[in-house]
Amino acid sequence: MPDSADTIYALSSGALPAGVAVIRISGAKAFIALRALTGRDLPLPRTASLCSIRNRNNEIIDQSLVIVFPAPNSFTGENCVEIHSHGSRAVMASIFAELDNLGGLRPADAGEFSRRAFENGKMDLLEVEGLADLLQAETEMQRRLAVEQSSGQLSALYDGWANRLTRARALIEAELDFADEEDVPDSVATQVWEAMAALKGEINAHLQGGGNGEIIRDGFKVALVGEPNAGKSTLLNALSGREVAIVTDIAGTTRDVLSVDINLDGYLVRIFDTAGIRETQDVVEREGVRRAVLTAETADLILILQDNDSTPKQSIGSFDNQRSLRVRTKTLLRSRASDDDFDLSISAKEGIGLDELRRALKREIEKRVGSGQTLVPARARHKKRLEETLNYVSDALDSETLDLAIRSEYLRLAATSLGRITGRVDVEDLLGVIFSEFCIGK
């Protein structure tokens, strides 16, 4: 693990070249480094000052805006410096060379600035994960989910629950220790378990949205399945707006699973084109069919495609009806099928029915995640810890015949599980994984 006593630096802005590049320095020697680079006293805290950045020969490297953030009022909680320079590779290389030459400074590892912010109490683990998701957000709903998490709204909810568990335990301890005292009202036990029953209901309702956050964050998975030449690859290309899949009249052209991401009104949708499902003696095609079925089974929604002039096989119609839509393709051709057999009719090649399909996809997404609801668990680990919390609270409520001390212990375990979501309880084994999601300089 990197030494948190080191002073670190990195490029914190985007790829070079750029109009402006931002170098961040954090640690005990950050201000010493800035004085060495500028040859002048520090500017006023949190005030942008124009300075000449110089090399060891006192030659000007660049004219830069410099901002200093004294500890603890900085992103990392340490002394921090930001240097806003022109974003050429030559300027950055020269400044980094001077920082290397100063001694006592080193380049930051991926996510190290954010890790220091966490270790210094500037962010909790939920906020760190939210920041990582915000940096990678590609759609409006991903941005909203990440902002609610990174701004502490989800942490506030979980901390509130933890405080209610702590208060319940305190009341139980009071009843255990001072049962004979008049200061402890007889109704304390009733209050505690009524409050815990209410908390159980809130956690349970929150968990109902447990998959919603993962769908928003990781994408709504849509599998295109059907017989060979049903129009799956043509539809994939039409929805993505580019030639992703090879389209021919030869049955079995698609052998492997292809995927493309699209932004559907703020939602990330992952569309999977699969091999045509049919009986075949071809070993490679048979493996493609196996993968097609597996992809469909793990998708959030299955689009079962059938062209106008074919009769669907039983194997195509055996998927979960609750997770599937039947789509008639190639609608400009003559048809043996009734429109009543399908949820949608399209011609991907001609662009017919695609807007209706997009609207149907959005309706399916919002049926799963709710319209605009983003205060939900965003990761599988959040859901796992919440389920643990719910189980412990349930155990405490259901153990009426057990000693109060045992029931109080269940509540302590529930609070511990909540604490592992925010990082209030030891989560050292998680930190390396989480901070590896960050780029250098964040």
Curated annotation (Swiss-Prot):
Residues that coordinate or bind K(+): N229, T248, I250, T253
Cofactors: K(+)
UniProt cross-references to Pfam families, sorted A to Z: MMR_HSR1, MnmE_helical, TrmE_N
EC identifiers of the protein: 3.6.-.-
Keyword terms of this UniProt record: Cytoplasm, GTP-binding, Hydrolase, Magnesium, Metal-binding, Nucleotide-binding, Potassium, tRNA processing
Domain TrmE-type G: 219-366
Principal cellular location given in the protein's record: cytoplasm
Disulphide bridges: none
Enzyme class: hydrolase
Note on how the cofactor is bound: Binds 1 potassium ion per subunit.
NCBIfam families the UniProt entry points to: mnmE_trmE_thdF (TIGR00450), PRK05291.1-3 (NF003661), small_GTP (TIGR00231)
Function: Exhibits a very high intrinsic GTPase hydrolysis rate. Involved in the addition of a carboxymethylaminomethyl (cmnm) group at the wobble position (U34) of certain tRNAs, forming tRNA-cmnm(5)s(2)U34.
Protein name, per record: tRNA modification GTPase MnmE
Record organism: Agrobacterium fabrum (strain C58 / ATCC 33970)
